[in-house]
Amino acid sequence: MNRANWFTVSPEGAKALGGLHHFVTTGTALPPKLIHLVFLRVSQLNGCAHCIDIHTRDLLKAGMSVDTVVLVPVWHEAAYLFTDQERAALAWAEEVTRVGETHASDEAYAAAAAVFDEKDLVDLTLTIAAMNAINRMGVSFRLKPRAKPDV
C-alpha cells in the first residue's frame, strides 16, 4: 500500500521537525560522531530502515570503523569499542527511547549526568527525542532506505 508523502502533504510539519533536527546537529556542543551514533541506535530500536541506512553511512563518513558500526546493536557486549561518553549516550538513548518501559529511571539519569554536564544532557535528550519523532514518521509512512540490492 502506498502511503502519504508527509513532506509534501504537511510541509510546515516537515519544516518544524527539520528545524529540531537542524538544531541538534548544528546547534549543540555534542560531537557529530556522537550524534550520529545516537541517531543510529535510536533508529535500530525503532526499526526505521531509512534512518538506519542514513546514519550508518554518516558514522562511517565521520570516521567510525565498520567493525564498530556493525556492533552498535550489541554495544553492551562490545563496550570496549566505545568511549565512556559514547557508552553513556547509548545507554541514555535506550532509556529514553523505551521511556514507556523505563520511565527514564533515576539510576539511568544519574549515570548519564556523571558523564555529561547539564546542558549537554538536555541537548542529548533533545537529540534522542528528535530521532524518535523522525523514526516514527519514517516507519509510519514507509520511507525506503537508499541501499540498492546486491543482485
Q: Model regions: which residues?
A:
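Hydrophobic alpha-helical segments
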Residues: M1-V151
